[in-house]
Amino acid sequence: EMFLNLGPQHQYTHGVLRVVLKLDGERVVDLDPVLGYLHRGVEKLCENADYHHVISQVDPLEYVSGLFNEWAPVMAFEQLLDVQVPRRAEYIRVLSAELLRVSSHSLFLGWMALDLGGLTPILWSFIERDEIIEMLASLTGQRMLFNYFRIGGVNGDLNHEFMSRLGSWMSRAAT
């Protein structure tokens, strides 16, 4: 009988979990997942923050697709305050978040390939991610912690640079 620690991985890598394995030879007979390595005390910080500050606090919780973290409290505040979001703002939210979803899935595939021994796909996935991040930076003004969603809409309309980058990216992605 032997115990083996898998992890914990660093909180800014693609795994934030520790698993304690109980082995009998090479056979896993039990495991104990240990969660909580991503906890940053945001709940406590948000207790004394106004609504707009909460949005900026949740961005770093999932750095690969932080707009989704902004969306949850914004929707909750909008429901509590009975705020109607313009349709265009909803479309902009969906568009920007879906771009991050593509980026996130691309990174997942790259990391998975790296874990299986392939180096090239992770490099390709970072190239793809960087293009999407630069596109969103032209829209939001920031590369990682966007702080773009607002109660009642977004922090700015679609601009020419973003639309141009989006068109180029979509043309290339379609081939």
Where would I find each of the regions flagged by the language model?
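Active-site bordering "gate/hinge" segments
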Residues: E1-R18, K22-T175
